[in-house]
UniProtKB/Swiss-Prot annotation:
A Pfam family that the UniProt record links to this protein: Oxidored_q6
Subcellular location: Cell inner membrane
Domain of life: Bacteria
Protein's name in the database: NADH-quinone oxidoreductase subunit B
Reactions performed catalytically: a quinone + NADH + 5 H(+)(in) = a quinol + NAD(+) + 4 H(+)(out)
EC number(s) recorded for this UniProt protein: 7.1.1.-
Record organism: Anaplasma marginale (strain Florida)
Required cofactor(s): [4Fe-4S] cluster
Assembly and interaction partners: NDH-1 is composed of 14 different subunits. Subunits NuoB, C, D, E, F, and G constitute the peripheral sector of the complex.
């Protein structure tokens, strides 16, 4: 007999044991909630710790295509020092979890961008940096320019500007960290 009056026959089946365990767990959690305790499941706690640790150790791979790449290099230099935020640039896509697309993406470079994105391990994030990467920019009407890298890869954060300042990219990285902590894995373009 359970405290809520439901009786479950004792049997050796796993389904019955799982049901009994779930009922007991729900009653236990409800008892703590009624007394004013903040209750969370262990798996939720582990997920939040993993998201927090993942946000503090972003390893971006640069995909510099034009003048925005110069501003991206400024953020890694001593004045802005991305290392203090746990951001370490990597040269290989297999070691990176963030791709920063900086500059004009041409039709000829689009397959290479997709190939590099596919080589990255999950979870992977993309930051689109600059007007050209966001929507074609100054060369929007050119026949050889892709009108936004989001047509090739899914983008998480858009950093506007022509070229965007190092502070803008730093703010975009901080926004990506907050997005990872919030845990919206399927939401793109925050």
């Amino acid at each position: 007999m359970f405290t809520n009056g439901a009786s479950v026959p004792l049997s050796g089946s796993k389904d019955m044991e799982n049901q009994q365990h779930q009922v007991l767990e729900q009653e236990l959690w409800q008892g703590y909630k009624d007394r004013g305790f903040v209750v969370t499941k262990f798996s939720d706690l582990v997920d939040s710790v993993v998201r927090w640790s993942r946000s503090g150790s972003l390893w971006p791979m640069t995909f510099g295509l034009a003048c925005c790449a110069v501003e991206m290099m400024h953020t890694a230099a001593s004045r802005y020092d991305l290392d203090r935020y746990g951001v370490m640039f990597r040269a290989s896509p297999r070691q990176a979890d963030v791709m920063i697309v900086a500059g004009t993406l041409t039709n000829k470079m689009a397959p290479a961008l997709r190939r590099v994105y596919d080589q990255m391990a999950e979870p992977k994030y993309v930051i689109s940096m600059g007007s050209c990467a966001n929507g074609g920019g100054y060369y929007h009407y050119s026949y050889s320019v892709v009108r936004g890298c989001d047509r090739i890869v899914p983008v998480d954060i858009y950093v506007p500007g022509c070229p965007p300042t190092a502070e803008a990219l730093l703010y975009g990285i901080l926004c990506l960290q907050q997005k990872i902590i919030r845990g919206n894995p399927g939401v793109r373009g925050a």
